Amino acid sequence: MGKKLLSIIIPCYNEEKTVETIYVAITDTMDMLPQYDYEILFVNDGSKDNTLNKLTGLSEMDVHVKYYSFSRNFGKEAAIYAGLNNARGDYVVIMDADMQDPPALLPEMISTLESGEYDSVATRRVSRKGEPMVRSFCARCFYKLIRRISDADIVDGARDFRMMTRDMVNSVLALSEYNRFSKGIFGWVGYRTKWLEYENIERTAGETKWSFWKLLAYSLDGIVNFSNVPL
């Protein structure tokens, strides 16, 4: 019987300063899990910097690395969907490129899914240390509102950093929403989820790509798509 495959999806937008760092951190972690095979799927979301060249170099150097590149910036949700659609793994995990999602959690996530008690291992921040106060306040207000008006299990402080079984990934892909809001979809499909908590980790390099207006549009997508209240 062959090794189980872990697919690691990493959306990237102008992350030339971080993609090599996250690659090294992931490979170091996976070297400690020789019983599993893995693929790293970078999705270049129309970056305007040197991200694509960095990804090309990594893929030429390491057969574990693949990349997909958009012609323009379609947004993180589109990149996540493209990654899920191309992932072949028995287990699939989504991570940010900026090292705010610690690869050191991967062994615990795999072990949890291997137990058979859960179909998903999700993560949430228990603090927003280092984040602008206005952004933290708006985020807390959004989560309070969405929990009041939606049946989807959307947890305050939830990250996109999540590992899922193949069955759950297939269920997520089966949903045909045009404007996708992954945090809501992951809760909506109803699989058993274990939550891991950790302190906020500031990005290692580069700048956040989430302006106030992008965050507002993202929040409105979540409210419109998952509200039980007539809008």
Residue ranges and their predicted role:
Residues 57, 68-72, 76-86, 91, ...:
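Acceptor/aglycone-binding surface of glycosyltransferases and processive sugar-polymer synthases
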Residues 179-180, 192-197, 230-231:
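Short, structured loop/turn "capping" segments at alpha-beta junctions
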